[in-house]
Amino acid sequence: MYLHSKLQEYDGTINIAFIGCGKFISMFLSQYNQLKKIKIDTIVDLDIKRAKSNCIKSGLKKETIEQIHFSNSLNDVLDRNIDIFIEATGNPLVGTQHACKVIQSKKNIIMVNVEADVLCGKYLSDLAKENNVIYSMAYGDQPSLIVEQIEWARLNGFFVTCAGKGTKYHPIFEYSTPKNVWDNYGITPEEAKKARMNPKMFNSFVTGDKSSIEMAAVVNASGLKCPNNGLTYPAVNVYDIANKLIPKDNGGLIDCEGQVEAISSIDIKKNQIKNDLRWGIYIVIKAQNNYVKACFKEYGMVTDNSGEYSAIWRPYHYVGLELAQSIYSIALDKKSTGYTKFFNADVISVAKKDLISGEILDGEGGFASRGRLITSKDSVEGNFLPLGL
């Protein structure tokens, strides 16, 4: 109750602004009426009519919407009394430009735009330090939640063997496009339209692009390693995480101690496995001595067969519904909920079809290319094109 207690004692108002008002922000807006001492000052969006419509559909009161300043230009609002900007466009190039402007205006920023964070996060976090402002991952997105679990483990003296997320993945999904995404995602086009789900964005979840991007963000925030040959997406249920997400030398599936991996909720036959982690996150920790191993057993903790490794997981992430955690952490505690510290991982573009000279790549979730997680060293030495470009 630490932050909640500070919130009760806080006598100010936390003024925020959104850059982009899509699904993630709409989820936050649906919680807004229950949140204390946060005021939406501004919403910047190219389509103001749609942004206002999303506010209405999310349940914002008419009088609340009338008090929000709407603009289609970030430049016009940088001088307003705003404590925290939330960049949620999903466009890596535009998002990077937005972040630079916000930071140089001495404003704190939360990057829902993990695509921009993976492309330029180290530069942006360094720029934030130079300007004495906070640059933060968005709580509710899986990278921030994974980093939180990693921090818990390290603070308590555990070695983190593996960390990652669940997803619905199959090798043939790598060639999914916005045209057939809903069949692969598991909902009807009508359901997707009603929920205002962007087919290109949600296709990035199916193809593995988003998982590669999010695991790169975790690597760059935590110092964990990339897998040797990209994410492999083994189908692993939660009670087998401690058995399978340990090094191959110890009977597991991963390359080495201290890496990331994403796991699939379906097997190679596309059957959903029992006790899957499609929407969640996990870490595997390693006991450093026999006494700790004994404690794992005595207190009923899930372990591998040797008893040396244990796993904890969170079955869901609540996406924009829990973004307020980042806002309060910055406003009340002057702390991020995770940020990029390194440039150790990159997500490169891999062709999904035969490309012709001059063809424009359409980025994550598109028709032309898909993303693969590799080390930044290999990316730079190979002169590979980042997916975000």
Functional labels for PLM-detected ranges:
Residues 1-7, 184, 188-389:
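C-terminal catalytic/substrate-binding lobe primarily of soluble NAD(P)-dependent oxidoreductases
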Residues 1-58:
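N-terminal Rossmann-like dinucleotide-binding module
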Residues 46-48, 90, 114-117, 140-141, ...:
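Short, ordered loop/turn segments at secondary-structure junctions
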Residues 47-80:
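Conserved N-terminal Rossmann-fold NAD(P) cofactor-binding segment
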Residues 76-88, 92-111:
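Rossmann-fold NAD(P) dinucleotide-binding segment
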Residues 94-101, 105, 113-133, 138-141, ...:
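Rossmann-fold NAD(P)-binding glycine/threonine-rich loop
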Residues 136-206:
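Rossmann-like NAD(P)H-binding beta-loop-alpha module
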